[in-house]
Amino acid sequence: MKFHGKKVSMLSDPSMITMLSNDFGYDHAYERFLDYYVEKDTLVIIMSSGGESPNMLNCLNWCEETKTNYGVLTVFKSDNKIRTVAKNALWNYHIDSDSYGVVECVHQIFLHGVV
């Protein structure tokens, strides 16, 4: 799908998630997705509730290594690993909430505003 001339994509296809997880392991599935789809001037949005997910940390490290633009949105603990490691993020937002309901709503509002 294109939006303002930019490709918009997210890894939500169960068959793609299964294939990437089986072939590369779940911790690297999303990182491999980036290998397939990221182009010049891509913006990767890294969202993690706990901020400790190895698969999201691998995506962040991939973005750092490839100098791909990325932003971070985490919740729960403010001193989470993703937030700490994200040195070159265009933004690094933390939502101070322990409620998954609030978190899901904020993620949805954020994505609606950005995408």
Range-by-range predicted roles:
Residues 1-115:
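Glycine-rich phosphate-binding loops that contact phosphosugars or nucleotide phosphates
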